[in-house]
UniProtKB/Swiss-Prot annotation:
SUPFAM superfamilies named among the record's database cross-references: Xylose isomerase-like
InterPro entries listed in its UniProt record: L-Ru-5P_3-Epase (IPR004560), L-Ru-5P_3-Epase_Enterobacteria (IPR023492), Sugar_Epim/Isomerase (IPR050417), Xyl_isomerase-like_sf (IPR036237), Xyl_isomerase-like_TIM-brl (IPR013022)
Annotated gene: ulaE
Identification of the protein by name: L-ribulose-5-phosphate 3-epimerase UlaE
Gene3D superfamilies per the UniProt record, alphabetical: Divalent-metal-dependent TIM barrel enzymes
Residue pairs linked by disulfide bridges in the UniProt entry: none
The entry's keywords: Isomerase
């Protein structure tokens, strides 16, 4: 029977680094999480996952079954290095190939949502042509995802092109496809000059998951919970009152910390306390 508990997950990069998914999922279970979000970033090491053998993919599936901890989503940030908006045709083609492989990987191991980075380009200067290429790349990507029944969900970013739900909704309306949705990060959303509550309400019906982290203006990573500008209780209240019932993912980068598990446990308790104050009693 499906649980009515609010699904709470942890980002892979919060946990100790390594390639043993059975150990990672066992640790996540011990720490009280329902799921882990996989990272496929721009490093060769994590990109190589998209070329895993059948046996390696099956090992992940078996680890999920054995532990009961799901891997329902992938954070695909590799497009920083190989952007869909690149004016270099070879780089852009590589970005589309990464997308194809990621969708196939997701289909094979049961990942339902691929979170996309909302960058047309990252290390280059953006212009009208990079934005056009990005739009066209998204259109091609969503066609692939539709055939595979895998949802692509764009993150609200630390970058002006996609720094609000309102902007992301523009792409959702442009693509007009149920396999393209939104994956807001309440930290990124709060670090810009946004009406956060209005933005969250505007996204309801398109939000498939929520990243939870703290931020400061101009500082989007590694801000300890409670030391930034995010009004967590109001964000959680707004999402609850708007009818959002989906997963929340604590995003941290503590994999190289002296004691990652202790850092994660501390963050989990802090976040769950704010959820409880917001009336999300299932999270207490």
């Amino acid at each position: 029977m499906l649980s009515k508990q609010i699904p709470l997950g942890i980002y892979e990069k919060a946990l100790p680094a390594g390639e043993c998914w059975l150990e990672r999922l066992q640790l996540a279970k011990t720490l009280g999480f329902d799921f882990v979000e996989m990272s496929v970033d721009e490093t060769d090491e994590r990109l190589s996952r998209l070329d895993w053998s059948r046996e390696q993919r099956l090992a992940l599936v078996n680890a999920i079954v054995e532990t009961g901890v799901r891997v329902p989503s992938m954070c695909l940030s590799a497009h920083r290095r190989f952007p869909l908006g690149s004016e270099d045709d070879a780089v852009r083609a590589q970005g589309l190939e990464i997308m194809r492989k990621a969708i196939q990987f997701a289909q094979d191991v049961g990942i339902r949502v691929i979170q996309l980075a909302g960058y047309d380009v990252y290390y280059q200067e953006a212009n009208n042509e990079t934005r056009r290429r990005f739009r066209d790349g998204l259109k091609e990507s969503v066609e692939m995802a539709s055939r595979a029944q895998v949802t692509l969900a764009v993150e609200i970013m630390d970058y002006p092109l996609m720094n609000s739900i309102s902007k992301a909704l523009g792409y959702a309306h442009y693509l007009n496809n149920p396999w393209f949705q939104l994956y807001p990060d309440i930290g990124n959303l709060s670090a810009w000059d946004n009406d956060v509550q209005m933005e969250l309400q505007a996204g309801i019906g398109h939000i498939v998951a929520v990243h939870v982290k703290d931020t400061k203006p101009g500082v989007f990573k590694n801000v300890p919970f409670g030391e930034g500008v995010v009004d967590f209780e109001r964000c959680f209240e707004t999402l609850k009152q708007s009818g959002y019932c989906g997963p929340y993912l604590i995003e941290m980068w503590s994999e190289t910390a002296e004691d990652p598990a202790a850092e994660v446990a501390k963050a989990r308790d802090w976040v769950k306390a704010r959820m409880a104050k917001a009336g999300m009693v299932e999270a207490a």
